């Protein structure tokens, strides 16, 4: 009768047998001269022993903690219900607010609009000159040159900042239409302002003669037209910005100036 006998061997006996056959030291024996093997410190790797088998036995999977920490960090930084994979990268964002003139509008169209506004500006100045019976021959060379340079500067500004001023005009017109109830009061204040300006200019002409009036007529017409437009816009957008107190102060200043001129 044959019996299958299997000897009972422990894991320690198997390791000792493998050492004796292969001549490999698994690092389980303690060297009395060197002492105990250094303990592996995960925070400071200076204590890592040279034997890789010992480090494997102390910390079987050193990447386990790193993966867990990385997963926890990503989970904490990711908001609930938000998928970062669908969000576009920040580097793709382009800031178009710094653009002054975009290529969406043809350059020829921008030039035509700008030159039309410059022509209107020149026609207003020419009309003021004709109103005061001043022809182009009466202007000096420097006056003509300054007029030409001012027209070129206006053309350059209108073309360079086309997107800016067109958007501002559109928003302003929309806002004025929303405030259409304030337009009658704005027209009334503009009318009062021009009446006061007329009497002021008439008083200055009477005090200093026609020569003073002819010299300042162009400036007076342009300045009063510009100020009238600004007063209308301010009063339409914000009623009371050019209030009665402001007009009263101007009247007091004009009366005080006329009294001083009469004394002289």
UniProtKB/Swiss-Prot annotation:
Coiled coil: none annotated. GO terms for biological process: meiotic cell cycle; meiotic drive. Disruption phenotype: Normal vegetative cell population growth. Simultaneous knockout of wtf15, wtf14 and wtf7 results in normal spore viability. The chain crosses the membrane at residues 107-127, 145-165, 180-200, 217-237. The keyword Transmembrane helix applies. GO terms for cellular component: cytoplasm; Golgi apparatus; membrane. The keyword Transmembrane applies. Its main location: membrane. It holds the Pfam family WTF. May act in meiotic drive. Belongs to the WTF family. Although the gene is capable of encoding two isoforms, RNA sequencing data show no evidence of alternative transcripts. This is Wtf element wtf11. It comes from Schizosaccharomyces pombe (strain 972 / ATCC 24843).
């Amino acid at each position: 009768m044959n019996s299958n006998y299997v000897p009972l061997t422990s894991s320690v006996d198997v390791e000792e047998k493998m050492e004796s056959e292969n001549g490999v030291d698994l690092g389980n024996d303690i060297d009395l001269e060197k002492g105990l093997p250094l303990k592996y410190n995960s925070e400071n790797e200076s204590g890592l022993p040279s034997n890789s088998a010992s480090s494997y036995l102390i910390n079987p999977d050193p990447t386990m903690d790193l993966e867990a920490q990385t997963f926890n960090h990503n989970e904490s930084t990711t908001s609930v219900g938000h998928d970062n994979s669908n969000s576009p990268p920040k580097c793709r964002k382009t800031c178009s607010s710094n653009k002054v003139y975009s290529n969406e509008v043809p350059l020829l169209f921008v030039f035509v609009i700008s030159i039309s506004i410059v022509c209107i500006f020149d026609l207003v100045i020419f009309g003021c000159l004709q109103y005061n019976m001043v022809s182009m021959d009466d202007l000096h060379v420097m006056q003509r040159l300054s007029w030409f340079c001012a027209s070129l500067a206006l053309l350059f500004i209108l073309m360079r900042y086309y997107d800016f001023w067109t958007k501002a005009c559109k928003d302003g017109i929309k806002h004025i239409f929303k405030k259409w109830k304030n337009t009658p009061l704005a027209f009334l204040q503009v009318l009062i302002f021009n009446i006061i300006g007329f009497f002021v200019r008439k008083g200055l002409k009477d005090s200093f003669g026609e020569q003073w009036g002819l010299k300042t007529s162009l400036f007076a017409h342009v300045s009063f037209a510009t100020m009238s437009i600004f007063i209308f816009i301010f009063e339409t957008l914000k009623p009371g910005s050019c209030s009665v107190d402001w007009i009263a102060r101007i009247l007091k200043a004009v009366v005080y100036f006329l009294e001083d001129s009469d004394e002289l």
